Amino acid sequence: MQAIHTVQLLLKPSKYECQEIDRRFHALAHLHNVCVKHARKCMIRLQHDKQYSEALQLYHELSKKEKLSKKEKSQKSELSKKLEDRRIELGLSKAALERYLKVCGKRFSKLLSSQQVQTEADRVWSGVAKCLFENGKGLHFTKYMDFDTIGGKSNKNGARFDLDAMYVNWIGLSLKCYLPKSENSDAYV
């Protein structure tokens, strides 16, 4: 496994570069909130689905029992599979949210990479999973100011640092990096 290090370098972006970075964060916030809206709709459909609620009730009854017979164990696994299939049919899965945001993300393809959009869908899915399988209360919309980073699935994608030229390249945007002048500085590399 490779070690990952974080280096903080000083950026002095121009007015245009600041606006471009803001556009990217606004695009990410918009995509996140669109995905949350879609996931909420799917969760409401799931709550009102009679097949799902009946299967879920049976599943909970079996889960409360301490000792299960082989027949009950197989019935529980069948119910689990049935619940999962119904969630997938209604569009509540990690892959379904990624597919949904893929379509929405085409509009922002010059601002965000596809893997950055997929990562945002994964963040929304983790919230959905907490609501469905744990003690989560509900999904929340996120304000633009609450985003402090745009993540990706790997280091090969998104913002890339060019050590020779001292630039950060990020889908058509090049930002000049500056090293601190003295070795005593906290941010010295």
Language model segments and positions:
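Nucleic-acid substrate recognition interfaces
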Residues: 1-189
